[in-house]
Amino acid sequence: PKELNKILKDDSSEKPFIVDVREDDEIAIASFSFSVLHLPLSKAANWSAKIGELLPKDQPIVVVCHAGVRSLNFGIWLLEQGITKRVWNLVGGIDAWSTDVDQSVPRY
């Protein structure tokens, strides 16, 4: 989380495209203060066929969830589908973001 925060604040670094795979009820509890693409995994049938259109080809992608497990699996899927070669998982998810970077983000 601290490394991502540093990248987001550094004007000279390439900004990642952030995908949040948590569910709607989780987003309602805790959300990031910056822009993310929300793709809840439970609704993958609605967006999986057009995933290549939803994600940028020229930006690194950071995938997030609550603790980092669902986002890790989604990141692996993106690699397997050939969608991107530059994908990272936010280890610890929004929970770690809350403890390590922004304590105003509620924990659940």
Residue ranges of predicted features:
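Short, surface-exposed ligand- or partner-binding patches at beta-edge/loop junctions that are enriched
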Residues: 64
